[in-house]
Amino acid sequence: MDMEGLGARIKSQSAMEYLMTYGWAILAIAIVMVSLYSIGIFNLGNLKPTATPGSCQVVRTATQTSLAGQCNNLIPKYVGQFGGTSYIKTGTVGLPLGNNQRSISMWVYPKSANNGAFYTYGTYASQEMVGLLITSAGSSLYFQVYGTDWDTGMSLNLNSWNFVAVAYNPTGNTVTAYVNGNTQTHSLGSALNTALPGSDPSDVGKIMNGQGQYAIGYIANIQVYNASLDNTTIKAIYKEGIGGAPIAVQYLVAWWPLNGNANDYSGNNNQGNATNMVWNANWQSGYTQPTS
């Protein structure tokens, strides 16, 4: 009797029986793992150390402005969760007024295309405010000034993280908008005349000055600058990802990471006062670290 041949047949039969018994389970696990990877879970690009609240901040002295703390290669432990009645009233020190240059960037995870406001400041009057919203028509990024508003037409992905930014230059009254690395530029036709009201001048999660239009979803890492940042700088902010520190700190006037609190870490003390806020630690689904 060919014992070696018999042994080989037994091993082959055992292997086939094993595959028939467990093959479908292995296939199902593989499909689940691929699905989780596609939505950001188990994506090795997202597995970075988490930043504790306030781990990085801007320090201002008489001679310089600089970053201090753990500021590199981190993602936030928390993000701000806005449920339709949530908002944060903020300080206004240094916010660009009149027709001056300005730039605003942030990460947003809209759950509804409901005309909700991500961040706004100013007075609810013609050309006297600035803000970023999501439209109900097309889920696009909307630059509101309560006058010559601009629907950028650049759609935001619902139930997913998006980087959004605008840079305003009074030369030609031009606005450059950014969504996930894509860019468009537009002339408003009229100059801004941003002015602060006596109450409720600056809000995250709704329109300021006693108005509504509440955001529904998550918001993180709001940065406000008193300069019209160029494409290279804003794209560098985007590539840093959701936990990125400000880059052009000499122009920074407000920085709300929303990592577990509403504090301003720009050094300007524009602290936020939060209402109905949840600080969510389970935010990574739908986020992928930018690579280009």
Where in the sequence are the language-model features?
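N-terminal leader/signal peptides at the extreme start of proteins
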Residues: M1-S14
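Extracytoplasmic low-complexity segments
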Residues: T52-S86, L97, T171, Q184-H186, ...
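Short hydrophobic/aromatic patches on beta-strands that form ligand-binding or substrate-lining surfaces
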Residues: I104-S112, V164-V166, V204, I219-Y225, ...
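Short, aromatic/His-centered strand-loop micro-motif at the edge of beta-sheets
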Residues: L141-F163
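Extracellular glycan-interaction patches encoded by glycine-rich segments
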Residues: Y146-D151, P197-A220, E240-I242
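Short, solvent-exposed beta-strand-to-loop segments that form ligand-recognition rims
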Residues: V179-S202
